[in-house]
Every structure is written in structure tokens, then in C-alpha cells.
């Protein structure tokens, strides 16, 4: 067997083993997420695409949460008004260049209803521009400088039901 064939065989075997391992890990994560959603169907499920999260002035570690498919935090909260705080980040490609945008710590209140699913994240277009204005329950415009009228991004909360 030639040296090249041996290297190719080793690479294929390693790839196959790693592929199987990651498929199992992904299945385990999906099962955990589905189980979490089922166990908390009587609560509001909030998908948060941010970091350094505090809910009602308590760290995320004190809340009932799991990690979602896109590394978002899925938090189960009771109905009512909740204060959410976090640092939001997003990436955009403008004219072939990648632009990373990161907010300062942003705090806002959301009135949640049990049995609904909510998504909170940073977007570069408003809910109206995305034609999702009917689903948006909160929209916070962000600018590069305080008091500026030049809106760079939005933090939007959508109700998915």
C-alpha cells in the first residue's frame, strides 16, 4: 500500500469517526432542547441571542435555561413583566467586508405570556423593513454614537407563539 493511500485512508477514517461523534452530540443537544421545551410548555420560552445575560437583575445561571441550536440561550420564564439585560452582537457583510457590531449593555422590559415563544436579537433592519412588524413586541434602535439619528442596528423582540 502506498504512503499516499495510507494517509488518505487515515484521514477518511478520522473524518468518519468525528462525523459520527458530532452527529451524536447534535442529536443529544436537540433531544435536550425538545425535552426542555416540553417540560416548560406552561411558561414563556425566550430565545436570547446575547451574552452577559441578567434576568430580573439575576445572572442567567440562576434561571431555568438551556443552549439552543445556534448557541442561543433558551430561558423559561413565568408570565408577566421581566427585565432582561445583555450585550448583543451581530455580523453583517457590506460590500464584501465583514462588519461586527456589538452593543453596550442594554436593559429592557418584556411582558411575556405563558405558552408563547419569543426571540430577542440584534438585527440590521427594523421589524417593518423585515416585514415582521406584526410579530415585533419590542424594538430598540441602536446608533454608533449617543443621541445620533443614524441608526446602525436594532434589538428586536419577536413573539413566535
Locate the predicted segments by residue.
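A short tyrosine-centered beta-strand micro-motif
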Residues: 80-85
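Short loop/turn and low-complexity linker motifs enriched in small/turn-promoting residues
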Residues: 1-76, 87-161
